[in-house]
Amino acid sequence: SIVVEKGGQQLIQLTDNGCGIPGDELPIAFKRYSTSKIATVDDLFTIDTLGFRGEALASITSVSEVNVVSASENSDGFEMSITNGELGEVQPAPAVKGTSITIRNLFYNTPARKKFLKSPRMEFRKVVEMVRRFALGYPDRAFKLVSDGRDILNLQSEDLESRIVHVMDPAYRDQLLPINFTKSDYSLTGFLGNLNLVRTRPGEQY
């Protein structure tokens, strides 16, 4: 689930029900260039995750106030706060399996960057577009987006065609043409809209 306030400028909260982060690894997760996704050099050729360089968490903690709560399976929960890039102490905390990261006051300490933010409305539109892209790319995952207390998206795990209909428009239901092509070592699967769904803007290509 993704919760934002004022287009993410005041609050961004990301919560998942994944494997969680053990308490003794929480500080490592926020150190630059630290990653749990690569164990050997060979892993570089089979990466299928959204990130692996260990930069995202370290970058966000340098420009915001961050709190993380996480619990792995059959383990107690742990919590840690990071302010201005400084890691706090890891503390026991009530938590279910998974991780929740809360980001407050984005760019509060870098006014030069903050001035480039658009209005909360415009930044919110960017958040919605990003969530839509992730939701379409991972239809087997549930996604929920809440903005300023309002439910914007609430998607359950489903097949790709149903996900397209729920994210884009119910009118897409009978207007999609399936693609399923395989050649040698690559394949292409997805859907095209028929002529009734032609748009003048190229933005609806996912």
Model-predicted segments: where are they?
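N-terminal phosphate-binding caps/lids of nucleotide- and nucleic-acid-binding domains
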Residues: 1-206
